[in-house]
């Protein structure tokens, strides 16, 4: 992973804290508070205790206790606002850095073959723009002519330039990046304010962040618990009246605030925002919080072999001619079919042929046939000759269509190359099969261990490749994936995704080409490469700025971290209520029912100190947990059952133990001050 586009700041850096403090007070409006039902109850309780404090002050009654509770409840609300403000401030800092990458540059627009200088903001979809070395790319687009080295560090943080080329899956360019060499013609794909950078800034700022389905479900649960505790507290008041020691309204409000799940209620918005923030720290732009959340629930990962499982630099390593064909004949035919092939594989075939002393000029009247995922072959036609190279099954079918024979040795050569983990490309000239070109790749170091981790997480990995089944099987075994789809076409990918989804599975995949767009849109998590085509980036619900195919594995871990953090803090928050129950409930009834003093297991000094201690802890635990909410609970690959048991022990047990200790310490401090 590369460095993020902005300098990483510590969680509590002065700039972020100042912004979060301002946001804490700005969010005190009823409209903002009403978005969070749990904290809205605390907000209303604060207003009511403030009213009772003023009423006591005016009528000459004691008001110190009421004022203390009011200030503590206000702090609880402010701390919850501060948590959300911290998460938002981090996003705004990142957005400011991204915005600095956007410059209003001049563009050289092509009109009827003539260049005219216009403002970058005046460009519209479909315009053709010329960009040369040293110039900024004015807007998002697709290269339609040429090849260039592009500096994308303003977007990705990666200082190494990348190659962008017309007619490939790496033809997409982003406004705000800089051309370092050569000349390209770009067709603009976004209007003013609609560029990828503009959308990134809007997403990072989170101005229109929507709650995710799990977040909504949890909010409903927390609201239900709040309603139950509200009814319970209201019911307690008649009991205290009947006992002859009516509880004050302020104490009942304090009890309610301590019992409702204010900890998770105050941290929930921050956890959701922080999930998208952690994705951005990994240089992944998530188009919604839902995309990050769903990544944590994914069951099946569809992974492209090239670039994800292997290094992705397949090179021609050997020519295997059939009987009756010389190596030079095979090399020449393969070279001719690859002269216009822009792929690394095609260029390596030309290089290998020339190493063997075989060379040939481009034939007169040559028409080059590009490779497509549907045909799975490429080649060249010129007068009297038609040469194709491609997948063995497709070339064999072509040979039969042309009336040629299938030499029995072909299958043996193909199988041997495949068993070695190389990709066999079969070459045919007219109706005569010439032999096989072996393309070799290398399994990425450590990838097998990574897949083992995913298996322990309960995920199934499927390798997608255009290779024949034997090659696919050899690589799948070496890499340790759970399954593979060989000789895959875009339609095959789509069909597999639909089948998995029909069986109730959530599917994640990555892609970079226009032909990947339908599958990216169909997948529950579609990670598009920033270097890919505009269609792929539009179809996916995440974009990887580093264009690293292995990033899909990291995205899944980020999603799981988000879900685990939310679950762990919810468990901790609800477990807190047990300790606060033992602190406040005896304080309510001990005067009327002295025998209830046995419930005062913490040995708190007095009813007043008990209530104050619980409310102080209830307020302070929110800022204490902010770093955990923003960083996330560390995720370790393990089964769902083991993960649940660990979280119940750590966060459930800790949620009971920590308040017992903290409330007792606060009570000792209050008792010392009061004495």
UniProtKB/Swiss-Prot annotation:
Main location, first listed in the record: membrane
The gene name reads: kdpB
Q: Which CDD domains match?
A: P-type_ATPase_K
In which organism is this protein found?
A: Deinococcus radiodurans (strain ATCC 13939 / DSM 20539 / JCM 16871 / CCUG 27074 / LMG 4051 / NBRC 15346 / NCIMB 9279 / VKM B-1422 / R1)
Amino acids binding Mg(2+): 512, 516
Tell me the superkingdom of the source.
Bacteria
Catalytic machinery residues: 304 (4-aspartylphosphate intermediate)
Alphabetic keyword roster: ATP-binding, Cell membrane, Ion transport, Magnesium, Membrane, Metal-binding, Nucleotide-binding, Phosphoprotein, Plasmid, Potassium, Potassium transport, Translocase, Transmembrane, Transmembrane helix, Transport
Spell out the protein name for this chain: Potassium-transporting ATPase ATP-binding subunit
């Amino acid at each position: 992973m590369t460095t993020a586009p902005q300098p990483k700041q510590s969680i509590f850096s002065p700039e972020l804290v100042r912004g979060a403090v301002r946001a804490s007070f700005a969010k005190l409006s009823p409209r903002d508070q009403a978005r969070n039902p749990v904290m809205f109850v605390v907000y209303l309780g604060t207003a009511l205790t403030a009213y009772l404090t003023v009423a006591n002050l005016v009528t000459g009654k004691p008001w110190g206790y009421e004022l203390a509770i009011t200030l503590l409840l206000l702090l609880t609300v402010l701390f919850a606002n501060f948590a959300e403000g911290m998460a938002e401030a981090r996003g705004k800092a990142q957005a400011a850095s991204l915005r600095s990458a956007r410059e209003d540059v001049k563009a050289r627009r092509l009109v009827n073959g003539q260049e005219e200088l216009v403002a970058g903001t005046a460009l519209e979809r479909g315009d053709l723009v010329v960009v040369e070395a040293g110039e900024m790319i004015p807007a998002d687009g697709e290269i339609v002519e040429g090849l260039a080295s592009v500096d994308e560090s303003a977007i990705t943080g990666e200082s190494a330039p990348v190659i962008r080329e017309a007619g490939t899956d790496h033809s997409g360019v982003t406004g705000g990046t800089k051309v370092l060499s050569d000349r390209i013609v770009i067709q603009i794909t976004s209007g003013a304010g609609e560029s990828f950078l503009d959308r990134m800034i809007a997403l990072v700022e989170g101005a229109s962040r929507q709650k995710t389905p799990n977040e909504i479900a949890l909010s409903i649960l927390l609201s239900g618990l709040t309603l139950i505790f509200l009814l319970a507290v209201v019911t307690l008041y008649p009991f205290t009246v009947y006992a002859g020691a009516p509880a004050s309204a302020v104490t009942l409000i304090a009890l309610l605030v301590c019992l409702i799940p204010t900890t998770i209620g105050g941290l929930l918005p921050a956890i959701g925002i922080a999930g998208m923030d952690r994705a951005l720290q990994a240089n992944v732009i998530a188009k919604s919080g839902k995309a990050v959340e769903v990544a944590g629930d994914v069951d099946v990962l569809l992974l492209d072999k090239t670039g994800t499982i292997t290094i992705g630099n397949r090179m021609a390593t050997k020519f295997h001619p059939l009987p009756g064909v010389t190596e030079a004949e095979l090399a020449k035919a393969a070279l001719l079919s690859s002269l216009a092939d822009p792929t690394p594989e095609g260029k390596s075939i030309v290089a290998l042929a020339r190493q063997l002393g075989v060379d040939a000029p481009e034939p007169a009247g040559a028409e080059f046939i590009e490779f497509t995922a549907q045909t799975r072959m490429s080649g060249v036609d010129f007068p009297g000759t038609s040469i194709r190279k491609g997948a063995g099954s497709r070339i064999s079918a072509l040979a039969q269509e042309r009336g040629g024979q299938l030499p029995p040795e072909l299958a043996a050569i193909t199988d041997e190359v495949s068993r070695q983990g190389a990709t066999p490309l079969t070459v045919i000239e007219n109706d005569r099969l010439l032999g096989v070109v072996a393309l070799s790749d290398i399994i990425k170091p450590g990838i097998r261990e990574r897949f083992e981790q995913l298996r322990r997480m309960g995920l199934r990995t499927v390798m997608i490749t255009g290779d024949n089944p034997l090659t696919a099987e050899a690589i799948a075994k070496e890499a340790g994936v759970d399954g593979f789809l060989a000789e895959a076409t875009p339609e095959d990918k789509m069909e597999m995704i639909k089948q998995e989804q029909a069986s109730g599975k959530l599917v994640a995949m990555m892609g970079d080409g226009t032909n990947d767009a339908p599958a990216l849109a169909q997948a529950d998590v579609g990670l598009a490469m920033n270097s890919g085509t505009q269609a792929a980036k539009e179809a996916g619900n995440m974009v990887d700025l580093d264009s690293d195919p292995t990033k899909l594995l990291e995205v899944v871990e980020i999603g799981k971290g988000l879900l685990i953090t939310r679950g762990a803090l919810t468990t901790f928050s609800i477990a807190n209520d047990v300790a606060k129950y033992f602190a406040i409930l005896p304080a309510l009834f001990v005067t009327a029912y002295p025998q209830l003093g046995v419930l005062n297991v913490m040995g708190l000094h007095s009813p007043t100190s008990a209530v104050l201690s619980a409310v102080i802890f209830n307020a302070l635990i929110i800022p204490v947990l902010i770093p955990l909410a923003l960083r996330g609970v560390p995720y370790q690959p393990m089964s769902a059952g083991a993960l649940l048991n660990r979280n119940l022990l750590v966060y459930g047990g800790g949620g009971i133990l920590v308040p017992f200790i903290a409330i007792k310490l606060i009570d000792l401090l209050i008792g010392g001050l009061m004495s």
